[in-house]
Amino acid sequence: FLTNEERDVSQEIKAVEISSAELSRLVAELVFEEILSGQTKVRHRETKADYDFNRFLDGAPYRQASHDLTLEVLTPVGSDYELMSDAKCIGRSAEGPGRAIIKLANEGRVDLELRTYLQIEKYIGPKNDLATPALKRILMDRKDENRQRRGRLLIQLATMMTNGKVYALGQQPSIKAQAPSTLADDLLNYLVANTYSKLGYIKVRAADPLAEIRAVLTADSVAQSKIAEATTEEGNALALAEMRQYLALAASQNRVLLSDVVDRFAKAPWGWRPAWETVLLVARLFMAGEIKLVMESNDLDGPGAVEPLTKEARFRNVSILKRKTNDNATRQKAREIHRDLFAQMPPDEQDALVATFRENLGARKAALADLFKALGGGWQDAYKPETKVVAATSAK
């Protein structure tokens, strides 16, 4: 039995206007913040890397974002829900680089419960401060009633999710789960695996990529010569070739920032995460002598590159430039000239070859200077005409 005041409150609540935008905001909050626990990243099971994703509800973004991956939830509250057939959902899931859709099952007139919940919340807010004791009791009862209604709505929406249909990348994958969180995780993992078609180029991931970067940058000369020649899975040959091809074009004329390289390969179709996987490839090409690393107008050497390549905040300070390297035939000819001059075969690696040439030429120059000095003057005097005459006369 309701009192007159309770009946009046009920009528006033029913008269409260609720817009479609308010309904959508509530559903988005219930689905994304409570049922899916505010999740904004998915951990790829195979690579253990994290991927951010956008959240959409009925075609509108929730908490604006601009990532490669998008998870959209279609609900009966949406104006186009009835029009979204399997064919249209499949087509919509093919939009953008990586999109997945969960279309909720249409069960139990959830829209009426959502509207009633919002009407009560909207009615109670401005009434509390000025309410009489009797009205305050009525409002508290309605607040308790709404708390229970919210719990029922969460259960109902969760059931509608697991009973719904899923679509991704223009397909309708066979993904079913008992819980909404598991459903979303399975669907997003499917999205990662099929959006990033070159994710598998990195076959082997370092257990400690930072330690691996340091090891590469401080490798000895023998190890350096083998760093970029890896053709096995352990050397991630496909990923290394992909990086080499990109830098051969992008960094041949202009310098490219390391931060831009990392951002590029984190996106589709590569999806290389974390950033250290990309930096490790750059470090290998650098130590193999294929690229130069420049910071503050100074060329970096291996040990000098350790600090900026192991701190993400420094990536914007490091520029990459493709080095001009000689082919095998040219290097072999230079090695043979060195052998003829100095009776020893120098290293094949370009930097080591140049360094050996300079060292031995410097030693030869010093030896000749000592020889001319021993003959009675500086080496410059040996070429003066009078020096040659004196030497010839003395010989007679």
Name each model feature, range by range:
Residues 1-375, 380-396:
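Extended alpha-helical interface modules used as scaffolds for assembling large macromolecular complexes
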